[in-house]
From Swiss-Prot:
Compartment(s) of residence: Mitochondrion
Gene3D superfamilies, alphabetized: LysM domain
InterPro entries, alphabetized: LysM_dom, LysM_dom_sf, TLDc_dom
SMART domains per record: LysM, TLDc
Biased composition, class Low complexity, residue ranges: 149-165
Record flagged with keyword Mitochondrion: yes
Pfam families: LysM (PF01476), TLD (PF07534)
Occurrences of domain GRAM (ranges): 209-267
Name of the protein: Oxidation resistance protein 1
Role noted for this protein: May be involved in protection from oxidative damage.
Organism: Xenopus tropicalis (Western clawed frog)
Amino acid sequence: MFSTRRLKKKSQSVDIAASGYNPLSDASAPQASRVPPPIVKAISEEEHHNTTNAQKRHLRRGDLKRGYTIDTGQKKTLEKKDGRRMSFQRPKGTMEYTVETRDSLNSIALKFDTTPNELVQLNKLFSRAVVPGQLLYVPDPDYISSVESSPSLSPISPLSPTSSEAEFEKSTDTERMPYKEITSSPAYSAIRPSRVVSSTSEEEEAFTEKFLKINCKYITDGKGTVNGVLLVTPNNIMFDPHKNDLLVQEKGCEEYGIMCPMEEVTSAAMYKEIVNSKLKDSVSVDVGQLSCMREFCHLKKISPGNLHDIDSQMWDAGNDSASTAPRSTEESLSEDVFTESELSPIREEHLSSDELRQDKSSGASSESVQTINQNITECSLNISDCVSASDDVKDSLEPSGNDSGIVASINDLEKSEASINAGEGVDKDISESSLILTEAIEGHNSNDGILSSNKDKQTGDQNHSREAAFVRNHQHETVQEEAVKQSFGDSETEAEELRKFWKDLTMQQAKQQREDMQHTTQKEIMGKMPTAETHIEGVCSSVAKEKRRHRSHRYLCLRVGKPMRKTFVSQASASMQQYAQRDKLEYWFAVPHERSDHLYSFFIQWSPELYAEEVRESAREPGFVVVKKNEETEGSDCSTNDSAARLWEVVSVAEYHRRIDALNTEELRTLCRRLKITTREDVNSKQATNIKNDQEPESFRPNLSDPSSLLQTDQIEKLTKHLPPRTIGYPWTLVYSTAKHGMSLKTLYRTMLGLDTPVLLVIKDSDAQIFGALASEPFKISDCFYGTGETFLFTFCPDFEVFKWTGDNMFFIKGDMDSLAFGGGGGEFALWLDGDLYHGRSHTCKTFGNCILSKKEDFIVQDIEIWAFE
């Protein structure tokens, strides 16, 4: 019994604890009507609710802490796999690119017209190695960057949830926490600022300043002007043409891609205009094209749909003269997007101003209707509703600038007409007020002067009478209906006439306004698009003129010791073209005005440094020295016009010393001429000139193994002056002649076997004209062109002339079983012979830049001689 009682007490205690009983109420447990105290239960529920909220609040704080902190190390496995990609969002003006199998960082940079260093900076790469399948951010060619932001310097978001979600969670937690908790724990009241991953560090900024990337134009000599990018680094200067340029698409990028080491640059000068007479006469550069290109493309990207929005916005802003000042055209065009919150106040004020204008500028008929309404003392509710509906119709017929407003106004008019004609109680109310209106009209006709003199008083009485009629209509509606039936049973005809009068008046005004609106809107719609296009073109032209005024171009002249190398050809071809253009030591570029100072600072700061000539001298001299205008005299290389047009010039140390020596030498020579002093150098130079003139005929007269039947002695001497240096001193050996070997190309190839020297081809045609070619290698059968830049063409028709390699291409010599050809390009050969060595043809070509060698384009071969040098 004792154990059973203890068991019951234990179970009872559990139930009591579970149900929230007070232990003091155990004695009264058998009573069924007794209920636990509600205060204890409410307290327990509140504690349970607070516990649950605290758990949720701590959970949300933990989530926010994990989302806004990237240094705690509590990242998930997925975040670790793609942690670097999640560390920043895609910068503005970039697009994603997946690395392919054969891609490298240099090839990707070349494909998207950028530099490898910029790709490293955009993607936060630790090395230049890329793997297939890797995602990279590359510049978007269709993106138009603004002045405020650029793709490389766009801010990067931290590794955190979206800002809207974070703010929502923070505000929710703050509202749920008690005020004491907020004040006592500031760590939880506000979210800790997260560590934002910056887009560029100080080291990267310093690194990016070590090169200049300038959009400019390369002005060539006789090959046009192309747009491209000039890349200036401390070690090299490189120009890459734009692939979208018309000349590049026509002739290829091989013609315009150039590069040279910085140590080869002897002088870099900036000019206001081109001082080279050849380039100045043949090339005209559009100085405003680069400066206004971005603004022009930005205006051109406005779609026709946006034109409609812009015009409507300009309409609203122009009509709202009472509330806002009119904006200029350029300012209205610069605001591409208007939010609804910005436009809604303008539209509301516009409607209010329209209502004011309507009240002030109503017609005579509307004034008469208003005068009649002022004299009405007792009017029904339906009549007042109809009058308000008609006023709404008039308001809705105000100009809105589009067709949808007209259609809506017509629909509102039809609805208002239907509301006038509908309702069972309308006829009763009209019949009730018809007599009052008739009396008012008669009183108006008889008391016109009184009404006009007491206009202000009647206006005040009008408001009072309308309010009284409104209250009286609600209170005594039934009484008025019975009175109308008893007293005015014969007034239905007058009410019908009044209704027709009101309807005709309203319809006439609505029709008049609708016709005016349709006519005006049609004109606006027909002239909107041409006007908008003309407006944009005008704005663009004004912008272009303004940019030309403030952003004129400057011309950069680079003088080098060796010709620049082609970058889009093989190394062997580049070396050969560099040899062919060995006389071209000057290159011109049209750069924007604001980049002139950048180039000047770059050459001074980041130019390669050269050691001094003295071995023991530890000090270094800068790579370039600034040349001042007062250091130049008449004996310098620059003329007076050159000095006037030049803004600044930096020269290498070697060039600076050379100019100083030349200046000193010229001053010394001037002094000697003034004092009539003859130096030893002048005497030796005069004697050497006399000796050279005496020995010149003998030195250029080679020994021939056989007498030539085609060349005279003076012609041989002229040809000898243009032969390659490795042929001088060797006798001329006749290896083939049509008089000895016959006229056969196969025989000619057979006689060339075993030779390893240049050969001279001399042709005489049926017109007795002498011309030919010097081949750097013996003639042979080949699948493609062969030879070197030593090859040239010559003619004695009518005078002696030599055409050497221009460097445009390497189509020197081509031999097969049926023909022998020299030069090429454009589908024509400079010199062509058939397999029988009987027919020939000569034409201009790009390889040698020659004219037609013979008197006629097609000729007949009379005799051929081939001489070797061995």
